[in-house]
Amino acid sequence: MKSGSGGGSPTSLWGLVFLSAALSLWPTSGEICGPGIDIRNDYQQLKRLENCTVIEGFLHILLISKAEDYRSYRFPKLTVITEYLLLFRVAGLESLGDLFPNLTVIRGWKLFYNYALVIFEMTNLKDIGLYNLRNITRGAIRIEKNADLCYLSTIDWSLILDAVSNNYIVGNKPPKECGDLCPGTLEEKPMCEKTTINNEYNYRCWTTNRCQKMCPSVCGKRACTENNECCHPECLGSCHTPDDNTTCVACRHYYYKGVCVPACPPGTYRFEGWRCVDRDFCANIPNAESSDSDGFVIHDGECMQECPSGFIRNSTQSMYCIPCEGPCPKVCGDEEKKTKTIDSVTSAQMLQGCTILKGNLLINIRRGNNIASELENFMGLIEVVTGYVKIRHSHALVSLSFLKNLRLILGEEQLEGNYSFYVLDNQNLQQLWDWNHRNLTVRSGKMYFAFNPKLCVSEIYRMEEVTGTKGRQSKGDINTRNNGERASCESDVLRFTSTTTWKNRIIITWHRYRPPDYRDLISFTVYYKEAPFKNVTEYDGQDACGSNSWNMVDVDLPPNKEGEPGILLHGLKPWTQYAVYVKAVTLTMVENDHIRGAKSEILYIRTNASVPSIPLDVLSASNSSSQLIVKWNPPTLPNGNLSYYIVRWQRQPQDGYLFRHNYCSKDKIPIRKYADGTIDVEEVTENPKTEVCGGDKGPCCACPKTEAEKQAEKEEAEYRKVFENFLHNSIFVPRPERRRRDVLQVANTTMSSRSRNTTVADTYNITDPEEFETEYPFFESRVDNKERTVISNLRPFTLYRIDIHSCNHEAEKLGCSASNFVFARTMPAEGADDIPGPVTWEPRPENSIFLKWPEPENPNGLILMYEIKYGSQVEDQRECVSRQEYRKYGGAKLNRLNPGNYTARIQATSLSGNGSWTDPVFFYVPAKTTYENFMHLIIALPVAILLIVGGLVIMLYVFHRKRNNSRLGNGVLYASVNPEYFSAADVYVPDEWEVAREKITMNRELGQGSFGMVYEGVAKGVVKDEPETRVAIKTVNEAASMRERIEFLNEASVMKEFNCHHVVRLLGVVSQGQPTLVIMELMTRGDLKSYLRSLRPEVENNLVLIPPSLSKMIQMAGEIADGMAYLNANKFVHRDLAARNCMVAEDFTVKIGDFGMTRDIYETDYYRKGGKGLLPVRWMSPESLKDGVFTTHSDVWSFGVVLWEIATLAEQPYQGLSNEQVLRFVMEGGLLDKPDNCPDMLFELMRMCWQYNPKMRPSFLEIIGSIKDEMEPSFQEVSFYYSEENKPPEPEELEMELELEPENMESVPLDPSASSASLPLPERHSGHKAENGPGVLVLRASFDERQPYAHMNGGRANERALPLPQSSTC
């Protein structure tokens, strides 16, 4: 892969060459740019694209952190990118359509990790917008982590790519938040064409004003012009003239001298995968990516940078390649610095792939972990060293086997003394090479060995013989005293006497070793390792720092001196070959005499076979109504020679739960999905012999993941690493590896015995409810030498379980593996849901008829319902008949038919969909006689009188009951004008709030509201003395019904009555025309719940904001209480007070939100009780949960929960409890716990709001009065509490009202000292009256005083009326 560069050197090199050729090879309107363009850090680098028609290479646009207006940058000439397009972290770019309006083809000749289009972390990108992009000829797309990117679900990528299975589109803006609209759909004049994606038939477009281009079906795979005329077959993407290969926008195969051709003409060569060039052109291209200056080569009709694998240049003067003899040589070396010093793994990396080292090799590795395997990886291909080899002070080396291919040391340059192989002072070196498998020649020079205490002299002498240097060295060149003095160099051979194997254990014994002095033998060490091939040596993978590929076990000497030592090796893998050898541990030197050692030859032994592991990645797809295609991968551990697979399948019974539903109810039709084609059907079915027969015929289950999905999961972590390494100008902190999804759970028993079922009686009856409990038999087949099969003769649209077992050569004795299984459903059969027989009818009394029909004999799964379409000549009516009703009556009755001629047709609906309509049946309903009408009148008149009298009695009873309830003190139910409670018959009438549509401008989306999208915009003249005002604009979804539009406007009408600083204001309404708009005060910081969560310290983007202090919490509480006090004063019960329904302004003021806006966004905060609407149970008071009573007292309870949300930064109340548990917990008197670090003052206020008796809770005015001293000074200027509207009545008036309405508990102040039936005025706290404000009740009762209304506390033990806390400075 080519690496990008921020500079211009490679681009300039290409540019010099291409500039002269561009005019002759492409239309004169532009030029060919290459070899790839990298634009980063500075948006002005985009000017490099100004004249580009084709980018021959890649295009990177990345790491531009400064947001700019890109509208001034437009590159209409660019039509083709030959490799890939990559965009990453470009701030401010909202669409690619303006940048590249005519980009038509991305060829994908070279890919960015399998992708031709990558859009990654583009934070401001709103749409892709490449409306002229017609083809991505190779590779997939990856669009990931673009938080604001929409219009992804409206693009049909299958029209652009040949295959979409490898596309990766994850982490972008959720489609339901996008509101994607294709051109014309809002005006109900759609301009775009429709296609089907994931079973959704919808319009396809790039943006709100650009459709996705589709060619007529007559063109097939050919491109087309803008006028939908078919292009020449050699054109790709588009063309200017039909059937003309000289006017193509891009070529399907190759471009040569203005013409698109299927192959390059003789004398020309393919270049960069898309055009033809001659030999002179290829010879003059500088190789910008090669370390030498040999230029490009010609091979197999293509002009390329380097010879392909297995080929080498014929000579340095030739442009042609010839096959290598063996591995292709790679010469390394520096003419100036002839000695290559290897002192670390890093320096060894420079020799990776080298086969010939021109110069000398000096190895000086003093330390390092796992050094041997690393050196072998980087130096293992070296065959020839032209100079000398010197190994000194390399204490980390045990062996030189890492130079596994070294065969020749030329010695053209030698050390002083004519040494060409020099080994000095290597304290742990024990082996040079395995001379049984090594041929090494030292052509010139001598060898020198000194101070290698563990290297036996015999090893050095053996090298003399193999390398042909014997006789060259003098006596002092190989020092026998300081080489091998610490090693057991003269070894006896230990011989194994017995071996016994199991599947995971080996027992070995060997002859007893007897040194001259038994005391010199200390113990034995057994070495063993996995050895797939019989080519291991004792020193493989060893270094002096402890790395060793061998496992070691110490064996003590047997107590009996005559006994044979042995060892049990356990924890081994089944059916695995192991290499084992034994070494005696002896004293190496006693009084300067060498002690003979002992070790065995390497023994190769294989463990026994065992049951295989389960097959992997079982997938199934259906290609017809009677077949399932099954594919899997071999087991990870065959534990033997894998011989065959057992495939077993079982039809699953229908889900009885489905049968209990009445599918005539709305939204009851289940998801219909069969096992769609997730694997290559042609590949599986190419051999009909793999089919197996026999079988039988259940509800949809989750489909198994496709191969593409699994591959995408595997590649994700690796892709991220490659991608982040590529962006070398940025610093990344890699995320922890994502865990792979667990494999399917399988049975924990092996299949040691099997019964083969070949036939089964078909007793299935769709009308029999017992079939829901049926246990169907398994069928079985053996599959040899393949990991796929086709199961035939299955029932249509039926669920099957398919088990796959692995079996190896020992299956007859050990059994097969446990199963891996998959569930799959066959496709529906055409016509299976049609009603087979004629529809008959019988007349019934009272203008009714009874229709009868037979059920489908073998439907697609379960019959859910029948639909009857009947009518006279005027209009058809429809009647739904549930399956249960049909089974009960054998048909359906049509009632209250008017006299006349009728036709009726019937259609069955199964799990897979609808059947065909039956042929019409004709019937006649006669008119009633006069006598019948008279009798009906006689019967109906008394019934009507009884119904009227009964209705009056019920009304009187309800009125009396309601009046008595109001006297019991259980709360007053105010008539609420909440927008959920209004008559749908109300019709909105424009008034002075109407705003002209042209005064409104929408800018950006804010979020989804109850009725539709909410936008930020600008309104002109809606606020006095402000020419323009930033506003929030609420809209209605285009699919909304008339009722919903009326609800939307009437909700706005409620807001017209409110004029309070702490309630979000309505600014205007646009009701004329479509869409309907409601203009609200803009609350830039969103809802209080989101705002509080953004203050959490762990939030990623919270770099400035800090959690609120106590004074800020009290300020929020006071502002919310002031807004609620205003609503209470206007006889409005909110019913849904919560942090999500409060809004935060630019100056951090908290206001009561416009009602209903957040109900969709926080849908999980609501709970549907029984068949009722959604209820916010976690914020509701006990009386509201029990009786559905909503009063200002219940709003106070909710206010206490809001205080708890403020203190916890918007945690969910009653965390850990389900909605049903919360409902019971609150009704039984449970309360929220005190939040961590919550000030006592705030928690006491919460507890006061959560008094079980509604009358014991303070009013909102009392709450404000208790904390008014803590509020900011501006609160007095803007609040309802201090306004003239809240001026309290005179004491005489209040006392008179109390005497006149003693049962009105709403007006009774909560005075703890009240103990008599008379209700005198409470005293003002400290005898003072608030300035510019009402008198305030401050509840400071002593707990020793008698508590009021103690009998009304719901029977809760030790319940006390908590006083409102005294405010204090934070």
Swiss-Prot record:
Q: Tell me the compartments it is located in.
A: Cell membrane
Location of the motif IRS1- and SHC1-binding: 978-981
Biased segments, Basic and acidic residues type:
1322-1331
Catalyzed reactions per annotation:
L-tyrosyl-[protein] + ATP = O-phospho-L-tyrosyl-[protein] + ADP + H(+)
Q: How does it sit in the membrane?
A: Single-pass type I membrane protein
UniProt-annotated stretches for the region Disordered: 1304-1370
Q: Which family does it belong to?
A: Belongs to the protein kinase superfamily. Tyr protein kinase family. Insulin receptor subfamily.
- Name listed for the protein in its UniProt record: Insulin-like growth factor 1 receptor
